[in-house]
A protein has these predicted regions:
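Short, C-terminally biased terminal segments at protein or domain edges
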Residues: 1-46, 50-117
Length: 117
């Protein structure tokens, strides 16, 4: 089931975001962008999990739409961190790819829930 894949991948992604946040704050002394990244990057899975326990398909769909927006915001913070030289190309490419994969899964799931195959 796609939702369980989303839950697994979003949790794994959140753990990567937490590690990146620690690195940015401890090693790079960056506190503003990293805090935004931490908030949005961990919120993806939280919203997916909340939706999985909603009362209806509409609840799940609504939470997945929020997760989708958080995913897009996370991409933005990652781009800024890369373009401002806080993270290097390999770090950026790796975590950004995971973020894009999550986005694809969430978009596909919301389309399926809405019957827009």
């Amino acid at each position: 089931m796609t939702e369980s894949i989303i839950l697994k991948k979003s949790k794994s992604f959140a753990l990567r975001i937490i590690k990146l946040y620690k690195y940015l704050t401890e090693e790079k002394k960056e506190f503003v962008l990293s805090k935004q990244l931490l908030r949005s990057g961990t919120s993806i899975g939280a919203n997916a999990k909340e939706g999985a326990y909603g009362q209806s398909k509409a609840d799940l769909c609504a939470r997945l739409f929020v997760a989708q927006k958080e995913c897009a915001e996370t991409e933005y913070w990652l781009e800024l961190l890369y373009e401002s030289n806080y993270i290097n190309q390999p770090e950026f490419d790796s975590i950004y790819k995971d973020c894009q994969e999550l986005m694809r899964l969430i978009v596909a799931s919301t389309k399926t829930l809405q019957g827009k195959n």
